[in-house]
Amino acid sequence: MPAAKKLDLYALHAAEYVAPRTARLVAIKPAKYLAITGSGDPDGPSFGEKVGALYAVAFTVKMSRKKAGNDYKVAGLEGLWWGVGTTKWMIAQTRDEWRWKLLIRVPDFVTAREVAAAAKALLVKGKGKAIARVKLETLREGRCVQMLHVGPYMHEGRTMDAMLECAKANGLRFTGRHHEIYLSDPRRVRPEKLRTILRHPVR
């Protein structure tokens, strides 16, 4: 008997991940994510620890589902970013003031109970306290402006300016949190070649 085909969330929701190098409006359906929240400089140890915790839970849940006959590909890393206080536009704040929520998309059939069970099993193995902070969340973004950014993360401001102009041209404004979808691994790709989908809800 041939092996069952793995579910590929990016292929299943391809329209939501199309991002040319010009800003465009997209409609994003509600989606389930494994999520963990943190703050501070993304080059600091806390960020890496939470990325590791998120992937540990993601692969544990995936293997559990594979044994049950519901195999799927673990999706890539995504993140929500925002500032705090009176200046919520994070580009105006120091990196130590940034707030972020790291995300990995999961199929709709994944439940909070199995995420909790995966985290518990990892904690029993002594895999790190950050594991306990991984939760299942549903993100409801709806209408968004989306665009592909190529280059260093620190140069995203120019891409965001183009996205903001797109929103204004359609009589819309930014709302909610800045969303990044990482298509490149910064450990293996030069900064000028990094590819990141930028998304921002509008209304």
What are these regions (language model features)?
Residues 1-203:
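A solvent-exposed interaction/effector surface
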